[in-house]
């Protein structure tokens, strides 16, 4: 009887195996579609391949979630100003992963083909003449500024924006890879890449938000830029790699307001590849690693600078005497543990009206500085090439 039971069991297993082999395996199609218009409620796009058409505005009370691994493609050929814009009160959730980033790109792979990601909040700003509100320079003419230091515009993690930085036809308005207007400290910005845009990689217009693990690669204007009294104080691991065309590694200004506060950024790598020219050509002297102007200030530590060796370029440029008097002599610019890897001079002013000298301890060097420390992954790879240099 035991032998009979065993034989029947083997037959049953064999039949089950045959049945399994004959089953059809089906795969679900990858979602596609167009993201366009205003978003006024909660909207989620699952992992898929989408197009963006026109300026998509996330209105107050609305939210947009795009799942990890998705690709969103703009097109200069559609004749619209493609951009993703978060208005104050709206929220954007792009929570990619190292292996599955959320990628925004453009069909022709032409720098400046679309407007990138733009976010507005109501965190504090200090604009020209001390004003606390201002109008955006992205062509949308939206007001920004407020008193909400903890403004929360959502979460951006492992996001790559390619070929953005659209310049508008009025010759004054422009967009960047990422533009943050009075964004607050409740917003999460981590592991973001701005790749080959026609303007700045990242620009902060006031606000209190901080950003971790940023890569600005091959952008035509400045790699990192801010104004309007931006005061994010928990920034770390910023990498700029300028190649072919690029201006300043970091352009730092405060609209000529002598603020008592400033941002803090630790672990910075600024690299300019050989042969890189400024956006304006040989006539534009915008080739320094770091420029302070109009009372820009802040504390920057563990900084590694390489390749800024164009004639007359310098690691740190103080652009005007007011900035030197108020911020350098006033002790509100600190550059700590700076390592210069080549013949780039340490710092210089403009003209002959002042000679740059820092108070003791406010400019220090170190041969062991490491700069940005970033973890490799698909989030930082384009066309098979790692952006982490």
Predicted features along the sequence, with ranges:
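Bacterial Sec-dependent N-terminal signal peptides
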Residues: 1-36
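Extracellular beta-rich repeat passengers
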Residues: 25-27, 32-46, 52-59, 64, ...
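Catalytic metal-binding/acid-base residues of hydrolase active sites
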Residues: 71
């Amino acid at each position: 009887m035991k032998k009979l039971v065993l034989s029947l069991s083997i037959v049953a297993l064999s039949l089950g195996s045959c049945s399994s082999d004959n089953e059809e395996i089906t795969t679900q199609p990858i979602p596609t579609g167009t993201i366009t218009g205003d978003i006024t409620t909660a909207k989620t796009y699952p992992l898929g391949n989408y197009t963006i058409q026109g300026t998509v505005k996330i209105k107050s009370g609305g939210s947009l979630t795009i799942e990890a691994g998705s690709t969103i493609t703009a097109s200069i050929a559609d004749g619209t100003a493609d951009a993703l814009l978060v208005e104050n009160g709206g929220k954007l959730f792009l929570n990619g992963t190292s292996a599955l980033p959320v990628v925004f790109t453009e069909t022709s792979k032409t720098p400046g083909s679309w407007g990138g990601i733009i976010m507005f909040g109501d965190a504090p700003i200090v604009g020209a003449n001390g004003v606390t509100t201002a109008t955006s320079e992205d062509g949308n003419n939206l007001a920004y500024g407020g008193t909400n230091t903890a403004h929360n515009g959502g979460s951006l993690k492992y996001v790559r924006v390619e070929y953005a930085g659209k310049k508008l036809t009025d010759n004054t308005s422009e967009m960047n890879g990422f533009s943050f207007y009075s964004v607050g400290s409740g917003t999460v910005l981590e592991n973001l890449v701005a790749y080959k845009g026609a303007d700045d990689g990242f620009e902060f217009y006031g606000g209190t938000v901080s950003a971790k693990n940023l890569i600005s690669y091959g952008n035509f204007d400045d790699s990192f830029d801010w104004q309007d009294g931006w005061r994010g104080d928990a920034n770390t691991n910023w990498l700029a790699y300028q190649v072919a065309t690029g201006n300043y590694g970091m352009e730092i200004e405060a609209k000529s307001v002598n603020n008592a506060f400033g941002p803090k950024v630790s672990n910075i790598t600024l690299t300019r590849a050989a042969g890189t020219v400024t956006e304006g050509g040989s006539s534009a002297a915008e080739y320094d690693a770091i420029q302070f102007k109009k009372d820009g200030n802040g504390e920057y530590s563990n900084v590694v600078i390489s390749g800024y060796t164009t004639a007359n370029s310098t690691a740190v440029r103080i652009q005007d005497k007011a900035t030197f008097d108020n911020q350098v002599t006033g002790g509100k610019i600190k550059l700590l543990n700076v390592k210069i890897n080549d013949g780039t001079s340490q710092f210089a002013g403009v003209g002959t009206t002042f000679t740059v000298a820092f108070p003791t301890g406010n400019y220090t060097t170190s041969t062991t500085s490491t700069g940005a420390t970033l973890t490799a992954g698909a989030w930082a790879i384009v066309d098979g090439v790692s952006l982490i240099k």
